[in-house]
Amino acid sequence: MIDAKTCINDAQEKMDMAVMYLEEALAHIRAGKASTRLLDGIRVDSYGSMVPISNVAAVTTPDARSIAIKPWDKSMFRIIEKAIMDSDLGITPENNGEIIRLGIPPLTEERRKQLAKQCKGEGETAKVSIRNARRDAIDTLKKAVKEGMPEDEQKNAEAKLQKVHDKYIAKIEELLAEKDKEIMTV
């Protein structure tokens, strides 16, 4: 028989994963200032395998409006440039032979609104995952009642589950509010 604590812990793990997914997704959304994390999702072909740019070059942010990429192998310049151009960053790399520089342009009001909308979409995806985890746990608890779990224990577990759910939804709202503030700050 499944006990309530295990059921709640399993749901909490799934909810943690949803929050981690959201944090990762929000980190890749450009908020107007330079961050090396913008390049985390971009992979380049290095000797037959696809690797992150940070594995083949030093990636730094010399100031708030630019990212500098210094490849360790000169043959990687073109490959890195192409990967950045093919990505959905919307930034054109400048290559001076020594360093690839990415100038982060200030965001227009329209682009800020698009990014805020994209953040809300990612937040909704995470909320749906959390709700699904809660629903699955409640279904498991209902099956456990049929297998002999006392109904009082089930009701208490559902109440705890709701509190956990509310905590995670609040965490998502907090993350979204932070990112929205970051995006909308000129």
From Swiss-Prot:
Gene Ontology cellular component list: cytoplasm
Keyword Cytoplasm in record: yes
Keywords (A to Z) from UniProt: Cytoplasm, Protein biosynthesis
Localisation per UniProt entry: Cytoplasm
Residues forming coiled coils: none
One GO molecular-function entry: ribosomal large subunit binding
GO biological process: translational termination
Primary localization class, coarse: cytoplasm
InterPro entries in UniProt: Ribosome_recyc_fac, Ribosome_recyc_fac_dom, RRF_sf
Pfam families: RRF
Similarity field: Belongs to the RRF family.
Function in brief: Responsible for the release of ribosomes from messenger RNA at the termination of protein biosynthesis. May increase the efficiency of translation by recycling ribosomes from one round of translation to another.
UniProt-recorded name of the protein: Ribosome-recycling factor
Species for this entry: Phocaeicola vulgatus (strain ATCC 8482 / DSM 1447 / JCM 5826 / CCUG 4940 / NBRC 14291 / NCTC 11154) (Bacteroides vulgatus)
Upper taxonomic lineage: Bacteria, Pseudomonadati, Bacteroidota, Bacteroidia, Bacteroidales
